[in-house]
Regions:
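The feature captures the beta-strand-to-loop junction immediately N-terminal to the Walker
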Residues: 41-43
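Helix-to-loop junction immediately C-terminal to a conserved catalytic motif
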Residues: 56
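Short coil-to-helix segment of the ABC ATPase nucleotide-binding domain corresponding to the Q-loop/switch region
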Residues: 102-110
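A short, proline-enriched helix->beta-strand linker immediately N-terminal to the Walker B motif
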Residues: 161-165
């Protein structure tokens, strides 16, 4: 039986913009399963990034239920949500979220430091992930000196270092040419297959949807599934 990694039930979210209350998510209900890649797409301002941030515990919904790997995010305080992001769920923002003046090794080590992992375990895990990502020769490179493709791989390595159940990526190929975008898409497929990770990608590029198992479309804050869930696919 396929396990649910993320469960969203009747999720609503509004923001006050220019003195006006704007609803960006409306009654969103969905399941995302372990071992699948889900692509979320839709027009600009449709609520894609907001939904990703809610799953990551970076934003809270106005109402509705969000459960990630069995954890009800509504029941967690800010410290609990922060710990969740260092253990269960990893979020890669569109700008990669890397610390520019640190080395590749130092950036990848950050989640383990925040989670209080002891030094010997940190060193072993960072080395393992960098080798997996093909970055073993870049450990001492300063992130600001790397190419866009290399920076994205560092961001993914950092997201993987805590062996998350759920990996969230906001427009992961937006700053890449198509050749490097394909490499990133293939990398997400390898992560899915090797670790059984649920990978959720927000994208505006319909070509990237060729690499996902299931796609969800957001229109005016409403989520519409346009391919069958993994539980019923043949």
């Amino acid at each position: 039986m396929v396990e649910v990694a993320v469960f969203l039930k009747d999720v609503w979210k509004s923001y006050r913009i220019g003195g006006k209350l704007v609803t960006v998510l409306r009654a969103v209900t969905a399941r995302i399963y372990k071992g699948e890649i889900v692509g979320i797409h839709g027009p600009s301002g449709s609520g894609k990034t907001t939904l990703l941030r809610i799953i990551a515990g970076l934003d809270r919904p106005d109402r509705g239920e969000v459960i990630v790997d069995g954890y009800n995010l509504n029941m967690l305080d800010e410290l609990g949500l922060a710990m969740l992001r260092n253990t269960v769920v990893s979020y890669i923002p569109q700008d990669y979220g890397l610390i520019e003046n640190l080395t590749v090794w130092e950036n990848v080590e950050v989640p383990l430091l925040l989670a209080g992992v002891e030094k010997s375990v940190r060193e072993s895990r960072v080395k393992e992930v960098l080798e997996y990502m093909g970055l073993a020769d870049k450990v001492n490179a300063i992130v600001s000196k790397l190419s866009g493709g290399e920076r994205q791989r560092v961001a993914i390595a950092r997201a993987l270092v805590n062996t998350p159940t759920v990996l969230l990526a906001d427009e992961p190929t937006a700053n890449l040419d198509w050749e490097n975008a394909i490499k990133v898409a293939e990398l997400f497929k390898r992560i899915r297959d090797d670790f059984g990770t649920a990978v959720v990608i927000v994208t505006h590029d319909p070509r990237l949807l060729e690499f996902v198992d299931r796609s969800l479309n957001i229109v005016d804050g409403t989520l519409k599934e346009i391919s069958p869930p993994i539980s019923i696919r043949k």
